[in-house]
Amino acid sequence: GCDLSTCATHNLVNELNKFDKSKPSSGGVGPESP
């Protein structure tokens, strides 16, 4: 596994990316994606 703080941060980012598809890191197709 990994330490709780790191996992919690990654999980939070992943949850946010589900709703913000404009984030390039989310792999979304929003206007901000390259």
Curated annotation (Swiss-Prot):
The keyword Disulfide bond applies. Keywords: Amidation, Disulfide bond. Disulfide bonds join 2-7. The modification Proline amide is found at residue 34. This is Calcitonin-like peptide 1. The lineage of its organism: Eukaryota, Metazoa, Chordata, Craniata, Vertebrata.
